[in-house]
Every structure is written in C-alpha cells, then in structure tokens.
Amino acid sequence: DVKPQGIEDFGVGDDPNMMFAPNNNFYYITRQVFSPHFDLGSGKDAYFEFPAKATGNDCFSAFPSVNDWYETVKLNYGVDYGNGSRHFDPIPDTWFKMVNILRFWASKGIDAFRCDMVFMVPVEFWGWAIPLVKEKYPHIKFIAEIYDVNIYRDYIYNGHFDYLYDKVSVYDT
C-alpha cells in the first residue's frame, strides 16, 4: 500500500466543524460521535469516529441503522444536501483526488471501471473526470450502474459513460 507521492488523503484540510463546505472531502455530523444502533464490536481495536460522517447511502446521522451503508462514507462532490445548492466552480478538492485515483488505476493497465451507483455522484463530476482519464488512456471503458431510465441519456451524453447497466432485472428474474 503505497500512496503516490504528492497525493493527500481524503479529509486532509477539511473543516470537520462544518457539515458542508465546498472543499471538504466528507460531510460531517458535527460534534457527534459515530454511534450506530448495533454493535460494531469492542476491545482495543473498536471503531471510533469523531465527528461522525455521512454514510455512502446518504444517511446524514451519527446513528445509522444496520441497513445503512455504515461501512462507507459519503464523499463530498460539492453538493450541499442541506439546501440542494451545487458548488462546482471552483472545482471541488474531491474531484481532483478522485481523478488522481482513476488515473492511478488506469496506469496499472486496467481495461475498465465499473462505477457503482453513479447517480449518487453528480453527473457533472463524471463529465469532467472521464474525459481527463481518457486523454491519456483512451482505451479504458467506464461502466455505470444506474436504475432510473429517465437519466440514462444524461450519464451517456453528459457523463461520458461507455455503458450503463441495471442489475435489478438480474435479481428479479
């Protein structure tokens, strides 16, 4: 596990006293300890998080349920979920960090990215990031998991995805 030189971890430089700030990488549940409604275990390696962060499935609470994606964290792509405002100019720090991650893996010779739940990330990010990756790695494919047929075109034409998939029909057959 070697981080590329000059790349900062997510959260470095964040203001954890702000639920939302355009250049924070995370959404913080300020002044609250992560306290799920189920046991995460105990002992010397018990998990502790302060302040709590929003989960990957948009649970903006320090008290997620076992059905929330408590093992993931919601990245801040510049959307203030408190009022719905979007802050994409200047480009948010998370966008730069994510495109660095995409380029890192592309440099390892992978042939595609399967991007889960893409509709939970602004299409504007994908429309910015995918062309940047394809500048140097034009062969690489981007495959999007998406379920709302009403936004398929947006993710193809504005998000620049090569393929979309909806696995609901796979599970429901």
Language model features with spans:
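Core domains of carbohydrate- and sulfate-ester-processing enzymes
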Residues: V2-Y81
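Active-site-proximal helices and loops of the catalytic beta/alpha 8
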Residues: K3-N17, A21-N23, R31, N100-R103, ...
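Short low-complexity stretches enriched in small and charged residues
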Residues: W69, M98-I101
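The substrate-binding groove and active-site-proximal loops of carbohydrate-active enzymes
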Residues: E71-T94, I110-M120
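Aromatic/hydrophobic pocket-lining residues that form the small-molecule binding cavity
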Residues: I91, W95-M98, W126
